[in-house]
Curated annotation (Swiss-Prot):
Record has Phosphoprotein as a keyword: yes
Protein name: Serine/threonine-protein kinase 11-interacting protein
Organism in which the protein naturally occurs: Mus musculus (Mouse)
Biased composition, class Polar residues, residue ranges: 441-454
Gene: Stk11ip
Residue spans of biased composition, Basic and acidic residues class: 478-492, 501-510
Residue(s) carrying Phosphoserine: 388, 390, 393, 757, 761, 763
Length: 1072
């Protein structure tokens, strides 16, 4: 092996280290090796320089060898460098290399170790260096932490604490739970557990006393992880893309400065109450949560922030933007509607942290939150106290608490939460949209109370001022201080004022509750008698407390047996299915302790369409004496609600009518589009897992999607037009002929969904091209069509280039039963069509003499009058281009025989006379070489320009083409009955100019973007000039991007024998 030619792996590695060994030995550069290469080196070392015993540790001094042996000298040099290497990266490619252990024995001085896809059970030699490692990265290698931390991989030993380890990255693994091996990382400061399958961290992070940065994003956590001791050192916590519904537990992290809980399931701003105690917090990310869609989200969030954090000198960053003075003023206005006090803190440490309820003052801080100030004693003042007598009402379920103690506040907060919960249950998941409706009814539970931490933030300050304005009785009290002397001034007691206002708010709230109950009783009629049931919780059938089941015309209630309180209220309009559970399933369920079994009791199963998982399934064991008859009575009442839901418009399961919306990026898509997403990280998937989400957003990859409700009042035609406008990839305003957009992104990525917008770009298909807005149809009939017998057939909005011109312009191509019209789009598509459409050209269908489909089906060339005129349509989407050609061909075939011109469409062929042939191959006799052709857009700063991308097996070209060609271009041939059946190709073709070219070997990586799925960046690195460059491209559909990556990957990986690196970033940065 060592006597092989100098191009062997050993000689190449030795030569590389002789040139760049200083950077490796100093730790500035990382030595990256394939596991197969490391195995080969170990075999050579053991053969010529070893062998060494399994207990060999420390630096190895090599024996002397003859100096005239270049092989031995090369191996000695290589072994010495490996022993002194500080940073190592190992990459494992499945199926490459020899079976057996992967030994890292030669590396004696490692400080940083990175493992990518390395089977951890095959890694040997870690026990000799783990105590000196400062940074450890392990991706796509482990399923449990103890495999690496406790057993040291393939060494299978009992490891002691990793005393020097400061940073650990265990992202992109298959971790489902943590274990006690984390206690070995006592000095750890940075921990990354993102992109795993963790559901609960339990208490395994409590031993990491020095932890400062914790990243557990993209997991399945439902609770905030506990960090110890008391989270004193933690400064950054990233919990993005989990399943958090509450932030309880964050109040312990006193020094937290950066918190990221974006894309979770936080529904209300009341869940942000723990943020009040985080005085050092400076960055907060909440985007993608249900509360983020609140119209007053920023103002409502600022209400729950600590005054010290909100008023920081450098500004508080909320969702990446500084909290503005306007947000704080809105908070101040909303807080000024009623007395506001500091929210209660959780018992997280000492008793001093949870005390201080009665000593809170009424003065507001600059940000609208009350500042706590000590009470002053004024001896010269005479306080006149008014008696506050409050008797319990007969309708109150329990006595009202007047004591201004924490217990009294808790009761008030609890009542407010119940009222808010009833409001949300009434309106479902879209409860924020009914805010104005609720306020006009006067039953809004969103009135501001004394405790902003556990109350809903004000939605509309102007509306709430009318609801929560103080009574006119207080005017008398304002006049009394003017009638007394300065020394004997009358001043009400602060606590008495709070008590009175609390009484009034509670009284008004109880009145609203009574009115709601009366309205409910008056409107909703009982559909059957109450049934005695026992709820069965979960799939295990754990028995709950017995209750009555009431069914009204709109709701289903669970009512307590003794106090007759409503335990649960479910909407019948959300009922999906009502069925009787089979006896075999019921007999196999366990019974909880303390609750006797119900042998033979039938089980009623109800399924609802709520988003919350706890409310989707209800199972009741019917305990009536005649249980079978009672169940049949319930089914007879509930089944009509499920059948009505199935008959509603949009409730069918037709995949063509259903649409989803992503909660992260608000993108709307069809079910079939969710399977077209790119796997940009395909080369780095776990070797032992291949999972796929059933419904994911094709734009950002999130699985937090909801099914949009289809309104039955919208006509199908209008709905189809809106979907076609959203799905089309050809809603192009202008490129080349008109100024580009300032953001540099082609306009087809920004499509309006306004009701007043025009739908001009239907999706491929006959029904799509034939549907048109009725206003546009009227304009065509009156202003464009010249013959009274002329009828509209189809249309498409597409960029067009006329013969003899180089710039393309947006155009509406309209086909009637006699003519083909080109209507130039002058500007914004709004208002009367005459203001933004200009008739440019009219061609009789019988004059068409040729139709040619361009390369890869991305353009369509039309000729008329025997080649005297021509134009090129540039949809750039092969599927849409072929669909329109098929539609146009059908119109031509439907012409009368006297007007029918026997022409058929041809496809552009690559021959030795083709314009691309010099770039593909110089041998005219050779077959057509393999290539990939794509029409796209090149982003240059803030503007874009149309280009063509040509890929061969060795070179990448950026081309500037003139689609219109010159006047001397040969016409398209006419294929008639007398001519040959073999279609002739186009002549010399459009002019061509190479803008830029790069060899395939210089391609280093491909960069994609989650929020811009149609943009990509090809990054090149020239090893000779050591310069890096890139091509920022934009395609018109996701299929083109997928095909482009697939075509590049095969020859590139064959050239380098490793996977092509694709990097996915969150957003497109136009400044780079």
């Amino acid at each position: 092996m060592t006597t092989a030619p100098r191009d062997s792996v050993v000689w190449k590695l030795a030569g590389l280290l002789r040139e760049s060994g200083d950077a490796v030995l100093s730790g500035c550069s990382t030595l990256s090796l394939l596991t197969a290469t490391l195995q080969q080196l170990n075999r050579v070392f053991e053969l010529y320089l070893g062998p060494w015993g399994p207990g060999q540790t420390g630096f190895v001094a090599l024996p002397s060898h003859p100096a005239d042996s270049p092989v031995i000298l090369q191996l000695q040099f290589l072994f010495d460098v490996l022993q002194k290497t500080l940073s190592l990266k190992l990459v494992h490619i499945p199926g490459v290399g020899l079976p057996g252990p992967i030994k890292i024995f030669p590396f004696k001085s490692l400080r940083q170790l990175e493992l990518r896809g390395v089977p951890i059970h095959s890694l040997c030699g870690l026990r000799g260096i783990y105590s000196q490692l400062e940074s450890l990265v392990c991706n796509r290698s482990i399923q449990a932490l103890e495999e690496l931390l406790s057993a040291c991989g393939g060494d299978l030993c009992s490891a002691l604490p990793w005393l020097a380890l400061l940073s650990a990255d265990f992202s992109y693994n298959a971790l489902r739970s943590l274990d006690s091996s984390l206690r070995l990382l006592s000095a750890l400061r940075f921990l990354n557990l993102s992109h795993n399958h963790l559901q609960d961290c339990k208490g395994f992070l409590m031993d990491l006393c020095e932890l400062y940065h914790l990243d557990i994003s993209y997991n399945h956590l439902r609770l905030v992880p506990r960090v110890g001791p008391s989270g004193a050192a933690l400064g950054t916590l990233i919990l993005r893309a989990n399943e958090l519904r509450s932030l309880q537990g964050l109040e312990q992290l006193k020094n937290l400065r950066h918190l990221d809980v974006a894309y979770n399931l936080l529904e209300g701003h009341t869940e942000l109450a723990p943020l009040w105690l985080l005085a050092e917090l400076r960055k907060l990310y909440l985007e993608g949560n249900p509360l983020w869609f609140h119209p007053a989200h920023r103002a409502a969030t600022a209400q729950y922030l600590s005054p010290r954090a909100r008023d920081a000198a450098h500004g508080f960053l909320l969702d990446g933007k500084v909290l503005s003075l306007k947000d704080l003023q809105q908070t101040s206005d909303s807080s000024g509607l009623g007395p506001v006090i500091q929210p209660l803190s959780w018992p997280v440490g000492s008793t001093t942290e949870t005390s201080g309820g009665p000593e809170l003052s009424d003065s507001l801080s600059s940000g609208g939150i009350v500042a706590q100030a000590p009470l002053r004693k004024v001896k010269s003042r005479v306080r006149v106290r008014r008696a506050s007598i409050s008797e319990p009402s007969d309708t109150d379920p329990e006595l009202r608490t007047l004591d201004p103690s924490p217990a009294g506040w808790f009761v008030q907060q609890h009542r407010e939460l119940e009222l808010l919960a009833s409001f949300r249950e009434r309106f479902g998941c879209d409860w924020l949209q009914y805010r104005s409706h609720l306020e006009t009814m006067g039953s809004s539970p969103l009135s501001t109370t004394k405790t902003p931490a556990l109350s809903t933030p004000p939605l509309d300050v102007q509306n709430l001022e009318t609801v929560c304005s103080p009574p006119a009785i207080e005017d008398d009290t304002k006049e009394s201080p003017e009638k007394v002397s300065e020394e004997g001034r009358v001043e009400p007691e602060p606590q008495e004022e709070e008590r009175e206002e609390q009484d009034k708010e509670e009284g008004s709230r109880e009145d609203l509750e009574e009115e709601e109950e009366q309205e409910q009783k008056a409107v909703e009629a009982e559909l059957c008698r109450p049934m005695l049931v026992c709820p069965l919780q979960g799939l295990g059938g754990v028995q709950g407390k017995e209750c009555f089941l009431r069914v009204t015309s709109a709701h289903l209630f669970e009512v307590e047996l003794q106090a007759a309180r409503t335990l649960e209220r479910l909407e019948l309009q959300s009922l999906v299915a009502a069925e009787l559970e089979s006896e075999t399933e019921t007999q196999g369920e366990p019974v909880s302790e303390g609750s006797g079994p119900f042998p033979g009791a039938p089980v009623l199963v109800l399924r609802f369409s709520y988003i919350c998982p706890d409310r989707q399934l209800r199972r009741y064991a019917v305990l009536e004496p005649e249980a079978r008859e009672a169940v049949q009575e319930l089914l007879a009442v509930l089944t009509p609600f499920t059948s009505v839901k199935e008959q509603q418009p949009g409730a069918n399961k037709d995949p063509q009518g259903a649409r989803f919306q992503c909660l992260r990026c608000s993108c709307e898509f069809k079910p079939e589009e969710s399977r077209l997403g790119l796997e940009s990280d395909e080369g780095w998937k776990p070797l032992f897992q291949n999972t796929e989400s059933p419904v994911v957003c094709p734009n950002c990859g999130s699985d937090h999607v909801v099914l949009l409700a289809v309104s039955g009042e919208v006509p199908n035609r209008e709905q189809n037009q809106e979907e076609q406008s959203a799905d089309s990839a050809c809603d192009l305003a202008d490129h080349g002929g008109c100024p580009s957009r300032p953001d540099g992104i082609p306009p087809q990525t920004s499509i309006s969904h306004d009701r007043s917008s025009w739908s001009l770009s239907p999706s491929p298909g006959c029904s799509g091209f034939r549907s048109v807005d009725h206003r546009l149809r009227l304009f065509l009939d009156v202003e464009v069509f010249s013959d009274s017998e002329e009828e509209f057939q189809c249309c498409i909005k597409v960029p067009v280039v006329l013969a003899g011109h180089t710039e393309e312009f947006p155009c509406l191509v309209v086909v009637s039963n006699h003519m083909l019209y080109l209507l130039k789009v002058l500007g914004a598509i709004c208002g009367p069509p005459a203001s933004w459409l200009q008739p440019t050209l009219a061609i009789a269908l019988q004059d068409l003499s040729g139709m040619e489909l361009g390369l890869a089906g991305q353009s369509l060339r039309l000729e008329w009058a025997a080649g005297t005129g021509s134009c090129v349509l540039l949809p750039r989407d092969a599927r849409q281009c072929r669909a329109f050609l098929e539609e146009l061909t059908g119109v031509l075939q439907s012409l009368p025989r006297t007007q029918r011109n026997c022409i058929s469409a041809t496809e552009e062929e690559v021959t030795p006379q083709h314009r691309l042939w010099p770039l593909l191959g110089k041998d005219p006799s050779a077959e057509v070489p393999q290539f990939f052709y794509l029409r796209a857009f090149l982003a240059e700063g803030s503007s874009t320009c149309p280009v063509s991308l040509l890929l061969t097996l060795s070179t990448l070209y950026l081309l500037d083409e003139d689609p219109g060609g010159s006047h001397a271009e040969s016409p398209l041939p006419v294929v008639s009955d007398e001519t040959s059946e073999q279609p002739a190709s186009l002549g010399p073709g459009p002019s061509l100019q190479v803008r830029e070219q790069q060899p395939l070997s210089c391609l280093s990586s491909v960069q994609l973007y989650r929020t811009s799925p149609l943009d990509l960046r090809l990054i090149f690195y020239d090893e000779v000039s050591r310069l890096e460059s890139f091509w920022a491209l934009h395609v018109v559909c996701g299929e083109q991007l997928t095909a482009l990556l697939a075509w590049i990957r095969e020859p590139w990986e064959e050239l380098f024998s490793i996977g092509l690196r694709t990097v996915t970033q969150e957003a497109l940065d136009l400044d780079r």
